Regions:
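Structural signature of PLP-dependent enzymes
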Residues: 237-241, 260-282
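Conserved glycine-rich beta-strand-loop-beta hairpin in the small C-terminal domain of fold type I
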Residues: 257, 273-282, 294-307
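Active-site phosphate-binding strand-loop segment of PLP-dependent enzymes
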Residues: 125-192
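Conserved PLP-anchoring active-site segment centered on the Schiff-base-forming lysine
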Residues: 89-111
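PLP-dependent enzyme catalytic core of the Aspartate aminotransferase-like
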Residues: 313, 320-329, 335-369
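A short helix-loop-beta submotif of the ANL/AMP-binding
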Residues: 112-119
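N-terminal small-domain helix-loop-helix segment of the aminotransferase-like
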Residues: 1-77, 85, 259-262, 368-369
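Active-site PLP attachment segment
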Residues: 199-236, 248-251
């Protein structure tokens, strides 16, 4: 909010890619608007049948797991709305959801909105999962654990072995693993490092998978995602979804159907650009080693550097940086207790923005030395 009142500020805060929705989707939706007389109407609460059936095929291609369009697929207005529906469905006051620490800040807020308790699961120093710690956090009030891989805010990709352990602990203790997946199409260096726990069929009764169109298709403003979930849970979640949302916007669902069915190489192009931006921001951070140290992210488009220079806390550091160099970063404390003394930087912005931000950061801290 402070940055919005500074018109000359350079922002590395918002995880909003600089890409435009691909042309084939834009042109396709123009055709639909001209030809489909129902394009402005409601759909069924769980989404267009054609889109849900295409999700079945897409999920099979991505995971090797076959699901049922009517029993297991639900279309949401973005992963955040999908998660909001899930938490509303599964939580009573005082119930607990385990979050990696650091985690996506909105997950904390959503759980608290329903008078639930976020239970923080601190990551190891290299941002990997501390599997031995997880069983100690499970209680009779545990409803779920939320996993984002590649991670927001760290960019870490959790290993197959780690994720399988999480799934087994959830199965043994009868709670859900919720996979929030906005970033799996943005994996750098080693594509084989990414593992989707939704590909483990024996976990189907304890697993909820949410895939967002926002990042991979540059459709953040369209508000669209899909959920794969057990039939009984879908039945209950539909009651909440219908009462609060009715349905995801039909026009967005039609765009999603185009996105999934027509061939395009845009994901590879996006990934190449983001990989170059990751390299650039890491190079610029290397020149600021007296201010930050960091781990190079495996995926997504965030870094989570630790603040080395003297400071009180992450929030005051971020405010000071904004007020004195007109560069906006997100305080790490927003992402959980372990985020303190870190900041999040998004490298989904263009190269000129990255360079401008670090020119200012370097100038500010050189003047302080």
């Amino acid at each position: 909010m402070l940055a919005s009142r500074m018109p000359d500020a350079v922002s590395l805060t918002w995880g909003l890619p600089s890409f435009q929705t691909p042309e084939y989707i834009r042109n396709g939706i123009i055709r639909v608007l001209q030809q489909d007389k129902d394009a402005g109407k409601y759909t069924l609460p769980d989404g267009l049948p054609d889109l849900r059936q295409q999700v079945v095929e897409t999920h099979l291609n991505r995971t090797g797991i076959e699901v049922n369009a009517d029993a297991n697929v639900m279309i949401a207005a973005g992963n955040m709305q999908g998660l909001n529906t899930l938490f509303h469905t599964m939580m009573d006051p005082g119930d607990e959801v385990i979050l990696t620490d650091p985690c996506f800040a909105s997950h904390i807020q959503q759980i608290q909105l329903f008078n639930g308790e976020p239970v923080y699961w601190p990551l190891n120093d290299d941002w990997s999962l501390d599997i031995e710690r997880l069983p100690e956090l499970v209680t009779d009030k545990t409803q779920a654990v939320v996993i984002v891989s590649p991670s927001n805010p760290t960019g870490k990709i959790f290993s197959e072995a780690e994720l399988r352990c999480v799934g087994e602990i959830a199965r043994q203790n009868d709670f859900f693993v919720i996979i929030d997946d906005p970033y799996s199409d943005f994996v750098y260096d080693n594509n084989s490092s990414y593992f989707n726990l939704a590909s483990v069929g024996e976990l189907a009764d304890h697993l909820i998978y949410l895939y967002s169109f926002s990042k991979s298709y540059a459709m953040s403003g369209w508000r669209l995602s899909y959920m794969i979930l057990p039939e009984e849970l879908k039945y209950e979640a539909m009651k909440v979804h219908d009462a609060t949302m009715i349905c995801a916007p039909r026009i967005s669902q039609l765009a999603g159907l185009i996105a999934l069915t027509e061939p395009s190489d845009h994901k590879q192009r996006f990934r190449t650009v983001l990989s170059d931006r990751r390299d650039l921001i890491c190079q610029r951070l290397d020149t600021c080693s007296h201010v930050f140290d960091y781990r190079k992210p495996d995926g997504a488009y965030y870094l989570f550097p630790r603040i080395r220079t003297p400071h009180h806390n992450a929030k005051t550091f971020a405010i000071d940086l904004l007020q004195n160099s007109a560069v906006a970063v997100t305080p790490g404390s927003a992402f959980g207790p372990s985020g303190e003394h870190h900041v999040r930087m998004a490298f989904c912005v263009d190269e000129a923005t990255i360079n401008s931000a670090f020119d200012r950061i370097e100038a500010y801290f050189s003047n302080r030395c």
